[in-house]
UniProtKB/Swiss-Prot annotation:
One of its GO terms (biological process) is neuropeptide signaling pathway. The keyword Cell inner membrane does not apply. It comes from the Eukaryota. Belongs to the FARP (FMRFamide related peptide) family. Signal peptide: none annotated. Keywords: Amidation, Neuropeptide, Secreted. This is CalliFMRFamide-7. The lineage of its organism: Eukaryota, Metazoa, Ecdysozoa, Arthropoda, Hexapoda. GO terms for cellular component: extracellular region. The keyword Secreted applies. It is found in: Secreted. It comes from Calliphora vomitoria. The modification Phenylalanine amide is found at F9.
């Protein structure tokens, strides 16, 4: 979410 888009996986 927001700046944590890299945690989508």
């Amino acid at each position: 979410a927001x700046g944590q888009d890299f945690m989508r996986f």
